[in-house]
Swiss-Prot record:
<dbReference type="InterPro" id="IPR002661">
    <property type="entry name" value="Ribosome_recyc_fac"/>
</dbReference>
<dbReference type="GO" id="GO:0002184">
    <property type="term" value="P:cytoplasmic translational termination"/>
</dbReference>
<comment type="similarity">
    <text>Belongs to the RRF family.</text>
</comment>
<dbReference type="InterPro" id="IPR036191">
    <property type="entry name" value="RRF_sf"/>
</dbReference>
<protein>
    <recommendedName>
        <fullName>Ribosome-recycling factor</fullName>
    </recommendedName>
</protein>
<dbReference type="InterPro" id="IPR023584">
    <property type="entry name" value="Ribosome_recyc_fac_dom"/>
</dbReference>
<dbReference type="GO" id="GO:0043023">
    <property type="term" value="F:ribosomal large subunit binding"/>
</dbReference>
<keyword id="KW-0648">Protein biosynthesis</keyword>
<dbReference type="GO" id="GO:0005829">
    <property type="term" value="C:cytosol"/>
</dbReference>
<dbReference type="Pfam" id="PF01765">
    <property type="entry name" value="RRF"/>
</dbReference>
<keyword id="KW-0963">Cytoplasm</keyword>
<comment type="function">
    <text>Responsible for the release of ribosomes from messenger RNA at the termination of protein biosynthesis. May increase the efficiency of translation by recycling ribosomes from one round of translation to another.</text>
</comment>
Length: 186
């Protein structure tokens, strides 16, 4: 394994951890309507369970109102049930093949709960990044032991790995602060 491939792999895996963190955060409900809120939902359709995006189009009508346009009239009931049962306390209003979903205000207690969950997601992402860092350091030590790189090169590369790690964790912290601000905004 070459030094370049090790560094590229580290960067790719750290970026993957950040992307996964962003994806987890997108599922957290804030006070503002977002189509990504309903994306994780699944609907029982045509004898199997499919993502809601495969049977309907989700859009934002107003800051506190989502619209779900179901493509097949027979699926309206199943989509409505999935939204009602998702655990977000949403009550869709059926209007033909469209569902309007007003988002209720979040109370202070629920906002703090969501911030706590966001912090847990952030910590999981930081741990994932530290695991990637450890793997990179282990690979560098192995290359040094095998004589493919000198001790000085290993030290220099270790510092680069540490910088990559610090940058990735700083990105996570920045994303977390933005999400926290969004959640706590009344």
């Amino acid at each position: 394994m070459s030094v370049t491939s090790i560094m590229d792999d580290l960067k790719r895996r750290m970026d993957g951890a950040i992307s996964a963190f962003k994806h987890e955060l997108s599922g957290l409900r804030t006070g503002r309507a977002s189509a990504s809120l309903l994306e994780p939902l699944t609907v029982e359709a045509y004898g199997s369970v499919v993502p809601i995006k495969q049977v309907a189009n989700i859009s934002v009508l107003e800051p506190r109102m989502l619209s779900v346009s179901v493509w097949d009239k027979t699926m309206v009931g199943a989509v409505e049930r999935a939204i009602r049962d998702c655990g977000f306390g949403l009550n869709p209003i059926v209007d033909g093949m469209n569902l309007r979903i007003p988002l209720p205000e979040l109370n202070e207690e629920r906002r703090k709960e969501l911030v706590k969950i966001a912090h847990q997601y952030a910590e999981q992402a930081r741990v994932a990044i530290r695991h990637v860092r450890r793997d990179g350091m282990d690979n560098l030590k192995k290359l040094e032991k095998e004589g493919e790189i000198s001790q000085d090169e290993a030290r220099s590369l270790s510092e680069k790995v540490q910088k990559l790690t610090d940058d990735a964790i700083a990105d996570i912290d920045k994303i977390l602060i933005m999400k926290e601000t969004e959640i706590m905004q009344v």
